[in-house]
Amino acid sequence: MVGGWLRGDWSVVSGAMFAAAWDRQAHVCDSFPIPDSWQIFRACDDGYSAPSSVHWIALDRANDRFYCIAELYQSGLLPEDLARLVLARDRSILVTDGYGRVSQNTTRLAGVIDSAAFSDTGTGSPARANQMNKLGCDWKPCEKYPGSVAHRAQKLHEYLARGRDGRPRLLRA
Protein backbone atom coordinates (compact mmCIF):
# COMPACT_ATOMS: atom_id res chain seq x y z
CA MET A 1 0.00 0.00 0.00
CA VAL A 2 2.78 2.43 0.88
CA GLY A 3 4.35 1.99 -2.54
CA GLY A 4 1.01 2.79 -4.09
CA TRP A 5 0.52 6.08 -2.29
CA LEU A 6 4.11 7.26 -2.18
CA ARG A 7 5.08 6.36 -5.72
CA GLY A 8 1.70 5.85 -7.37
CA ASP A 9 2.66 2.25 -8.13
CA TRP A 10 -0.45 0.21 -7.34
CA SER A 11 0.88 -2.71 -9.36
CA VAL A 12 2.76 -3.70 -6.20
CA VAL A 13 -0.56 -4.74 -4.66
CA SER A 14 -1.10 -7.93 -6.63
CA GLY A 15 -4.74 -8.88 -6.95
CA ALA A 16 -5.93 -5.64 -5.39
CA MET A 17 -9.50 -4.64 -6.20
CA PHE A 18 -8.49 -1.52 -8.12
CA ALA A 19 -5.13 -2.64 -9.59
CA ALA A 20 -6.52 -3.08 -13.11
CA ALA A 21 -8.16 0.38 -13.02
CA TRP A 22 -5.10 2.20 -11.64
CA ASP A 23 -2.77 3.96 -14.07
CA ARG A 24 0.01 5.99 -12.48
CA GLN A 25 0.29 8.29 -15.50
CA ALA A 26 -3.42 9.12 -15.39
CA HIS A 27 -4.16 9.06 -11.67
CA VAL A 28 -1.20 10.81 -10.03
CA CYS A 29 -0.63 14.54 -10.23
CA ASP A 30 1.65 16.95 -8.39
CA SER A 31 0.50 18.24 -5.01
CA PHE A 32 -0.94 21.74 -4.98
CA PRO A 33 -2.59 24.15 -2.53
CA ILE A 34 -6.32 23.50 -2.46
CA PRO A 35 -8.55 26.41 -3.54
CA ASP A 36 -10.56 27.58 -0.55
CA SER A 37 -13.75 27.24 -2.63
CA TRP A 38 -13.31 23.45 -2.78
CA GLN A 39 -14.79 21.13 -0.17
CA ILE A 40 -12.29 19.09 1.85
CA PHE A 41 -13.43 16.08 3.83
CA ARG A 42 -12.03 12.83 5.13
CA ALA A 43 -13.02 9.18 5.31
CA CYS A 44 -11.78 6.58 7.79
CA ASP A 45 -11.80 2.83 8.07
CA ASP A 46 -11.05 2.57 11.78
CA GLY A 47 -8.87 -0.15 13.23
CA TYR A 48 -6.54 -0.96 16.07
CA SER A 49 -4.99 -4.37 15.37
CA ALA A 50 -5.72 -3.83 11.70
CA PRO A 51 -4.54 -0.42 10.53
CA SER A 52 -6.75 2.65 10.58
CA SER A 53 -6.87 4.14 7.11
CA VAL A 54 -7.78 7.81 6.73
CA HIS A 55 -8.00 9.61 3.39
CA TRP A 56 -8.40 13.36 2.89
CA ILE A 57 -10.33 14.26 -0.24
CA ALA A 58 -10.66 17.63 -1.98
CA LEU A 59 -13.70 18.02 -4.21
CA ASP A 60 -13.50 20.27 -7.26
CA ARG A 61 -17.23 20.63 -7.96
CA ALA A 62 -16.70 22.79 -11.06
CA ASN A 63 -14.89 19.92 -12.81
CA ASP A 64 -16.59 17.05 -10.95
CA ARG A 65 -13.20 15.74 -9.83
CA PHE A 66 -11.93 14.31 -6.53
CA TYR A 67 -8.33 14.57 -5.36
CA CYS A 68 -6.94 12.35 -2.61
CA ILE A 69 -4.63 14.90 -0.99
CA ALA A 70 -3.40 13.00 2.07
CA GLU A 71 -3.47 9.60 3.68
CA LEU A 72 -2.77 7.98 7.04
CA TYR A 73 -2.37 4.23 7.38
CA GLN A 74 -1.29 2.99 10.82
CA SER A 75 -2.18 0.30 13.34
CA GLY A 76 -2.11 0.32 17.13
CA LEU A 77 -3.63 3.78 17.52
CA LEU A 78 -5.81 4.56 20.51
CA PRO A 79 -8.71 6.92 19.72
CA GLU A 80 -6.92 9.93 21.22
CA ASP A 81 -3.76 9.16 19.20
CA LEU A 82 -5.71 8.81 15.95
CA ALA A 83 -7.62 12.03 16.70
CA ARG A 84 -4.36 13.90 17.38
CA LEU A 85 -2.79 12.71 14.10
CA VAL A 86 -5.93 13.46 12.09
CA LEU A 87 -6.33 16.96 13.53
CA ALA A 88 -2.65 17.74 12.90
CA ARG A 89 -3.03 16.61 9.28
CA ASP A 90 -6.24 18.67 8.93
CA ARG A 91 -4.26 21.78 9.89
CA SER A 92 -1.29 20.97 7.64
CA ILE A 93 -3.32 21.04 4.42
CA LEU A 94 -2.31 24.01 2.29
CA VAL A 95 -5.14 26.12 0.89
CA THR A 96 -5.12 29.13 -1.40
CA ASP A 97 -7.57 32.00 -1.57
CA GLY A 98 -8.78 33.68 -4.76
CA TYR A 99 -5.76 36.02 -4.66
CA GLY A 100 -3.07 33.32 -4.72
CA ARG A 101 -2.21 33.58 -1.02
CA VAL A 102 -1.33 30.20 0.47
CA SER A 103 -1.89 29.30 4.11
CA GLN A 104 -2.52 26.31 6.33
CA ASN A 105 -6.09 25.10 6.62
CA THR A 106 -8.08 26.66 9.49
CA THR A 107 -11.46 25.17 8.57
CA ARG A 108 -12.73 22.47 10.89
CA LEU A 109 -13.03 19.35 8.76
CA ALA A 110 -15.51 16.54 9.18
CA GLY A 111 -15.58 13.06 7.80
CA VAL A 112 -17.25 9.71 7.67
CA ILE A 113 -16.03 6.69 9.57
CA ASP A 114 -17.05 3.05 9.55
CA SER A 115 -20.24 2.88 11.64
CA ALA A 116 -18.64 0.12 13.72
CA ALA A 117 -16.51 2.85 15.33
CA PHE A 118 -19.72 4.10 16.99
CA SER A 119 -20.50 0.66 18.44
CA ASP A 120 -20.53 0.03 22.17
CA THR A 121 -17.36 -1.86 23.04
CA GLY A 122 -18.88 -3.51 26.12
CA THR A 123 -15.99 -2.20 28.23
CA GLY A 124 -17.84 0.76 29.69
CA SER A 125 -15.67 3.11 27.61
CA PRO A 126 -17.29 5.34 25.00
CA ALA A 127 -17.15 4.12 21.40
CA ARG A 128 -13.94 5.02 19.54
CA ALA A 129 -15.66 7.55 17.26
CA ASN A 130 -17.37 9.24 20.22
CA GLN A 131 -13.99 9.58 21.97
CA MET A 132 -12.53 11.25 18.88
CA ASN A 133 -15.56 13.51 18.41
CA LYS A 134 -15.17 14.66 22.02
CA LEU A 135 -11.61 15.76 21.16
CA GLY A 136 -12.81 17.86 18.21
CA CYS A 137 -12.06 15.26 15.54
CA ASP A 138 -15.50 15.24 13.91
CA TRP A 139 -16.86 12.00 12.47
CA LYS A 140 -20.27 10.86 11.27
CA PRO A 141 -21.08 7.18 10.72
CA CYS A 142 -20.86 5.92 7.17
CA GLU A 143 -24.29 4.63 6.23
CA LYS A 144 -24.31 0.93 5.46
CA TYR A 145 -27.01 -1.05 3.72
CA PRO A 146 -27.15 -4.41 1.95
CA GLY A 147 -24.84 -4.21 -1.05
CA SER A 148 -23.28 -0.89 -0.01
CA VAL A 149 -19.69 -2.17 -0.15
CA ALA A 150 -20.13 -3.48 -3.70
CA HIS A 151 -21.97 -0.29 -4.71
CA ARG A 152 -19.17 1.94 -3.38
CA ALA A 153 -16.48 -0.18 -5.02
CA GLN A 154 -18.34 0.22 -8.32
CA LYS A 155 -18.48 4.01 -7.80
CA LEU A 156 -14.70 4.08 -7.23
CA HIS A 157 -14.16 2.14 -10.47
CA GLU A 158 -16.31 4.76 -12.23
CA TYR A 159 -14.26 7.60 -10.69
CA LEU A 160 -11.02 5.92 -11.78
CA ALA A 161 -12.25 5.59 -15.39
CA ARG A 162 -11.44 8.36 -17.84
CA GLY A 163 -14.22 10.89 -18.35
CA ARG A 164 -15.28 12.80 -21.44
CA ASP A 165 -12.27 15.08 -21.08
CA GLY A 166 -9.93 12.06 -21.07
CA ARG A 167 -9.06 12.43 -17.39
CA PRO A 168 -10.25 10.34 -14.46
CA ARG A 169 -12.53 11.84 -11.82
CA LEU A 170 -10.32 10.57 -8.96
CA LEU A 171 -6.66 11.52 -8.74
CA ARG A 172 -3.88 11.28 -6.16
CA ALA A 173 -2.19 14.63 -5.56
Question: Where are the model-predicted features located?
Answer:
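A residue-level signal for conserved active-site and pocket-lining positions in enzyme catalytic cores
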Residues: 2, 6, 54, 111
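Hydrophobic/aromatic-lined pockets within catalytic cores
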Residues: 7-11, 48, 59-62, 161
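Short, well-ordered loop/turn elements at secondary-structure boundaries
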Residues: 35-38, 48-51, 104-107, 166
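A conserved active-site cap/scaffold subdomain adjacent to cofactor or substrate pockets
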Residues: 37-56, 66-73
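Short catalytic/ligand-binding loop motif for oxyanion handling, primarily in non-cytosolic enzymes
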Residues: 14, 50, 120-121
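ATPase catalytic-site recognition across NTP-hydrolyzing enzymes
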Residues: 1-46
